[in-house]
Amino acid sequence: MPKMIRKVFLYRRRWCVIIFLSSVAIFVLSLQFELNAIEVTQRKSGNDFLRGQGLTVTARLKQNRYSSMSKSKDQVYQFALNGEGEIGKGHRRLRRGRRCARTKQQETSRFRELSKGILVFSVWYDNRKTQPFIRILLLMYRNDPPPSLTCSFQIASKQTILTTEAVFYEHNENHHDRYGGFVASCIVPREVETMPCSIKVSIKSTNKAQIVRRKSLTFPVSSTDRLENTVGGKYGICVPPLHGDISVDRLVEFIELTRILGASHFTFYDLAINEEMRKALSQYETKGLVSVLEWNLPEYTRNKLHYFGQVVSILDCLYRSMRDKSFVAFHDLDEFIVPLQHDNINSLLNEIHKDYHCGHCFESVVFDPSKDSESPNVLSRDRLVTQRIFYRTSQMTPYWTKCIVDPRKIFEQGIHHISKPLEEFYQAEKVDWNIARVFHYRKCQDSHALMQLKCSAKFEVDKTMRRFGEKLTINFKIASNATNRRNS
């Protein structure tokens, strides 16, 4: 009997060893299986999908038929992704590859229709978070479920194509219109070692007959990395899409006065302007002071989105400014951010801006051009609105603010406020209106658009702009003469 018990014990011990070794082997194989590809999964139900705050997303690296790896396996590596695109710890920066060879047309962003109702304007490589991302800025039909959109990265050295699925984030100022601004974010896989010059963006759609269709376009990728040899302290201006009958005088006055106030560069979006305006902008463009991008909105969207898709132009200019601007402001041609106790915006920011600030917002007062308070003797000054109109509202417009931001610290910028800093600890400061304010030259009306400002209330004289009058008059005359020679 004892011999029998000993045999059973030895027999069971051998099987325990075999089972243990098998378990170790399975664990090692599964670990190897997990480290060869990517799957990103986030879960959150309801309409939060479109807000980008913890989405249900799957991004999988797929090997194409030319890959040396097995065609039958999609190998998976899992990690957590939040709505703004942060993954794990340890910043990963791709090295710069060879200079991307592009035509002038490829360098200039414009809307391209990926499919009906999905319009891509520009594509950016963003490495500000711990995980690099491709950010696709687009206008999209809002009433349908978000499409299945993917980014494909080609690894030339391995003849491999890696594909990740996009996460959608909706801009918060789409105002319930049918079309709105979105950011679609694709993870840059770890196998991608150099910043891509281009990516293929694909969309999968299903028609009423349940036939699956795929459409793809290749887009150039621009980088948000600081350009080499760029000088810090540059202050840029982003102007929303230009349209309508805008006079050349107003444009030149805006550029010249804003330059006196500290701006070094302007970005404009051309929706529909006259030939004289284009020639005037071209004059500044040759000097490197202005960039003009075509805003080629399809007709079918124009009455179905807020202010000609302004929010996408804001996002595009934000990303564009990350490369060589320390600060950038977003406002219209009839607005000026004016320091009251400093010589210019740069000296103001040098004093008030701290490392924990992502930006500064300024309250507005309205100067009504119908209240022509001066009759200047000089013809050139007669052409300058800011040197002629000195009656403004005594009451400020606290909700109609305009902002100056550090573009690298912003995830989402609004029209009148900073919508979302890149990191939660960054602060947006409201600047005391006795230090600086927005001078807005427009007809003053009691309206919801003006946040119910009572324009029938008291007006008062404000001749702050006289500080800049002499220099502005000289610069305006020089610029106008140059523009006239170009037009003749």
Predicted regions and their residues:
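Catalytic-site signature of metal-activated, phosphate-bearing donor transferases
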Residues: 2-225, 232, 307, 311, ...
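Short, acidic, metal-binding catalytic loop of nucleotide-sugar glycosyltransferases
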Residues: 254-264
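Active-site-proximal specificity loops/subdomain of glycosyltransferases
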Residues: 14-15, 174-178, 225-238, 242-243, ...
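Acidic carboxylate-rich catalytic motifs and surrounding loops in phosphoryl-/glycosyl-chemistry enzymes
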Residues: 269-272, 296-297, 362-367
